[in-house]
């Protein structure tokens, strides 16, 4: 029996080793990967030993040469040269793996025996920019000591000869970029073999080269003449960018084509020449920031043959182009301007790649553009179902179904499908792709079919981002369902996130529905009035002039009113009435929200009544704002008395204008369709109001008998007078009887005139 505390006993089980070398030493079985690793490790060890040996030999040679160079010809040691080449400065610290010259200038000094008073000061040279970059992997880089050539200017006295370029040999640590560095060591040895301390080299002008090279290449370049070095760099650049010359020529032609002053004949020639350069090389040119615009220029020429040939050449690159920041514009341009067949080719090319494309910012834009603007219903269904799993990629269906219907038919697939959706949503809802309608559709499907725990997780990840995705139908629907599902604390956070965004949301086609859902469900009306309603009230003109903004104001005045919003929206909003987190009654909630809007609403109506009353699509809104409470209203709405009086006075000012039947310059409010509708709707409520708040009384007191009597000449005017007789008090009836000429009225046989005659006769009899 093995005791637990017995450390000498070996554990009988799977043997653990630290690396493959230990595995080989223990005689364990090696697989193919292990054998390859052992070969690489042995090669690296051999290279390291080879480099270490070369460095060691070189250091010994330098040590011998330095021991002999510090003596004069007579064998005595020179006091000035008794110090090392680094002077009294401390040894340089280990540098990074870039080779720079500025750091070494702080320590490398060239001394001359004739200088008696030697002062060592730190160099003020600005740091240089190294062109050396090691392309090898960090694991392959080895540190080696090699010789570097340093150039310094020798200080001469007044009567000395002209200065000479001298080189000081210094050993330091640098990067061994490749095994061939042994050759570089030998070449440096040969250079240092003549004079141990000084080497004459040709003067070279420093010129920044916009290309990166390895250390070995750099050492070769420093020993080349200027012309040879320039030619070598040009050749090296061409090897790295083989399409460079072609791209430059393409850009020159592109500039000629896009200039407005270029004659048409030259443009045509340049277009054909440019296409000749691009043809066969488009797949390489399309990904660069400059040449991609050249190809887009060819597409913009609207030459069908060129466009078709370019599209056919780039068809295999569609998915890759969609992922690139520059080439994606070619794909979008072909979606917009291409033929139906070309659009189908692009959309079909995305088959099997939709989940990957959605995770990439630029590719997601192209996928959204194709899905939202050009794909038909079946293509959209195929794109969406790719996110349900690989089975839906391989086996496509002709029958379009929702996820709920798919899960009802195949309940065993529910776990797998929801897992795929959860992974996609978790990967992209933190990025800019949150605004894409494809993701909104996926999140809505996921929310409708997942369990309670998943809904809570989705709410936690989206509760502070709801204003970002309410601009699409699926996004707005998801936001509304999240509001219904959210507890009180989360609802307050959602409301606060609409700060400074309420007006923008209210003016959106789908975003305004989310505000209506907040008005229906949030019990904290103080917070709603402070954050949302107050912002809406301050932008009353902008909202009322906007079709969607007017619906939001109408909803605050008349909630669930079929005259303001579609009945299907009312039915959908009613589904949230049964949520478990709303406790306040509708009467109290709507009444408190209405109180927050009245202070700005009615002064605006009174000040802009003439503009509103003659707009056909605003008449229902104005009438609804001035109506009294009916049995269909969800709360007791009371228009402030002063606000109603100011609106009545605005109507009276419009009615005072001279009435000219069928006026070509503009109908009178009595004859205008919208104006007459508002008058009749407001006076219909006079019976329930105090006498001083009635519109009929205001008209009777504000207009002269001549003005009132002139209204009998049109049918609509007779109807207005008839309504005033029916709802007005004794003063109104008396004023109208004195104003209407019965002889004049008998000359008209319109329906309104006949009804007015009957009403007057009835009143006379009474």
Swiss-Prot record:
Q: Where is the composition biased (Polar residues)?
A: 79-88
Q: Does the keyword Repeat apply?
A: yes
Kindly state one GO CC term assigned in the UniProt record.
nucleolus
| SMART domains the record matches | Pumilio
- Domain PUM-HD: where? 245-602
- Segment Disordered: which positions? 63-98, 152-197
User: Compositionally biased, Acidic residues: which spans?
Assistant: 179-193
Which molecular function terms from Gene Ontology are attached?
mRNA binding
Keywords associated with the record:
Repeat, RNA-binding
Q: Which species is listed as the source?
A: Caenorhabditis elegans
What Gene Ontology terms for biological process does this UniProt record contain? Answer: regulation of translation
Q: Where are the Pumilio repeats?
A: 313-348, 461-496, 497-534, 535-571
* Protein's recorded name: Pumilio domain-containing protein 12
Q: Name one Pfam family in it.
A: CPL
Q: Which gene encodes it?
A: puf-12
